[in-house]
Regions:
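N-terminal cap/leader regions of alpha/beta-hydrolase-fold enzymes
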Residues: 1-255
Length: 255
């Protein structure tokens, strides 16, 4: 598991940061309904973000994260990747996600991101001027791949993504798709994450360099996998810098 079931983003609510947040059911291009959670910024900065969860799907962690983005002026929507196998019903933190992970496919994932981006670009979603994706672990891999999706993104962000080699879902490796990328990349890792060695990070950087893609790679030497968690008090400074890096990449200052 990427996070414990009680994990939450390491970002306290902003006092007085009123936002409009809601549960949604969106439809992919093939008609598949999937759950989502959206939050609109009261004071928009022109940025919008599609949030791609880790293997847990649309966990409360990501609902909280949409609100933290909105408080920072970023219209946000988090999607659940399991609409095709688990339906669009709202689920709790104890959801048994494992049977659904292997049923993911790249085309379906891309279609769902496209539907979420279309919602954000609508009047209901806030119609931001520039769009990003951000993902965590498995969602990080999917987020990086959106740089080749043709969605007209301003950038993609991956936190502790596996960027090279095969994946049990069959999703392609971002490094292998780098020559198709069409926007900047921000990739962030824990240096103490044994699951993503330096060789994997370096290979992705090399692929991006070879493709001429603007990119920023941030490695926090002592941070583990899934360090961006309120419970990880030892990594509070790292989490604070991560948030600053994310907002800077989106062209806005820290809230």
């Amino acid at each position: 598991m990427c996070f414990p079931t009680d994990a939450r983003p390491p970002l306290p609510p902003i006092q007085g940061g009123a936002i409009d947040a809601r549960d949604l059911t969106l439809a992919s291009v093939d008609g598949t309904a999937f759950a989502a959670y959206a939050a609109r910024a009261e004071q928009p900065t022109g940025a919008g973000v599609v949030i791609l969860p880790d293997v847990r799907g649309l966990h409360p962690y990501y609902e909280d994260l949409t609100m933290r983005f909105a408080e920072a002026g970023v219209d946000a929507v988090a999607l659940d990747p399991y609409g095709r196998s688990a339906g669009a019903e709202k689920r709790d933190a104890e959801f048994e996600y494992e049977p659904h992970v292997l049923q993911l496919d790249g085309d379906g994932a891309n279609d769902d991101v496209g539907a979420a981006a279309a919602y954000l670009r609508s009047a209901d979603g806030g119609a931001p001027e520039r769009m990003y994706t951000i993902g965590f672990c498995l969602g990080g891999r999917i987020s990086l791949l959106q740089a080749a999706s043709g969605l007209g993104l301003a950038g993609v962000i991956g936190l502790y993504p596996w960027p090279v080699g095969p994946h049990r879902t069959g999703l392609p490796a971002p490094a292998d798709e780098a020559r198709r990328f069409a926007c900047p990349v921000l990739a962030m890792y824990g240096g103490a994450d044994a699951g993503i060695p330096a060789e994997a990070r370096d290979a992705f950087d090399k692929a991006l360099d070879g493709a001429g893609i603007e990119h920023r790679t941030v490695v926090y030497p002592d941070a583990p996998h899934s360090y961006f968690d309120r419970k990880a008090a030892d990594h509070a400074d790292v989490s604070a810098d991560t948030w600053r890096q994310i907002l800077d990449f989106m062209g806005i200052g820290s809230a």
